[in-house]
Amino acid sequence: MTKVIDYWHQPFTPELMKKAYIDDPEQGQVAKWWGLDIKGRTPEEFIADMDKYGIDKVLIPTGKIKSYMRQVMQWDFKTEEIYNIIKDYPTRLYGLHGINHEERMDGVRELERAVKEFGFVGAHLHTYGFGIPVNDKRYFPFYAKCVELDVPVVMQIGHSAEAMPSAMGRPILLDDIALFFPELKIVAAHTGWPWCEELIAMSWKHPNIYIGTTAHGPKYWDKNLVSYLNTRRGIGKVMFGTDFPVLNWPTCLKQIDDLGLRPEAKEQLLYGTASKVFKLSD
């Protein structure tokens, strides 16, 4: 059985799910609209579910999401909040540090603290509500720090389903970042839809750009993405994630089985690519 890494899973405890999807009215509306499971689980229950579905490792971000319409923070999770739910399972659960460019150098220093003191394995960016594109120079100090720390940055790329400007995450914007920071490992999440071909082109061109499949069910993946991840140039450039509660493990894994991927491509999609990019040891 192929091992699985979920490179992006939202905080899962009842307290943090409430903070994310009930306390904030906009995200609460999304949860109702999509019928999301937001009951939450204890860390012990979560690990039991991981074992049940063959999930070896999960990465959880300290989400930093700003409301574009209200100009207030929707999600502003803290390093310690995520560390407290992952600390007892250091080989199974890992943190990603959320980027808020408005924190300026305090934010850069907090990124370093999260990695060096709490063992976080990367950074995480959701730029849409801030109203600036991913290649805005205000993000460059954070990207430079990621290079210095040798950790990847995960960023949502493609449209935004919320009331936020989707153009902030056009895949072609990654060209600027990858050219300026050729050592920065970039995980472009959410398949880049509806600009999947544009994101594939960026991943094909740049050795340091990877594609993440979060928030889009495998049976709906763009046919060009499926072809890319199943061929020589794309094997090792695409990784699996759920963005739970948007997607869940059993449904996704069944749909991936139904794609009929080559064994090497399937192993890299589910485990190998994320293991390499985030340097996750067995």
Label the model's feature ranges.
Residues 11-15, 65-68, 101-104, 130, ...:
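Active-site environment of divalent metal-dependent phosphoester hydrolases
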Residues 118-122, 131-239:
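Catalytic pocket-lining loop regions of alpha/beta-barrel enzymes
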Residues 41-49, 77-83, 107-109, 171-174, ...:
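Alpha-helical scaffolding within the catalytic cores
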Residues 56-57, 62, 66-155, 159-161, ...:
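Active-site gating/metal-coordination segments in enzymes
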Residues 15-20, 70-73, 108-110, 165-167, ...:
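Short aromatic-enriched loop/helix-cap "lid" or pocket-rim segments at secondary-structure transitions
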Residues 8, 50, 82, 114, ...:
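Conserved, mostly hydrophobic/aromatic
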Residues 6, 57-62, 98, 187-189, ...:
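Short beta-strand segments
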Residues 2-57, 234-239, 247-282:
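Mid-to-C-terminal alpha-helical segments outside catalytic/metal-binding sites
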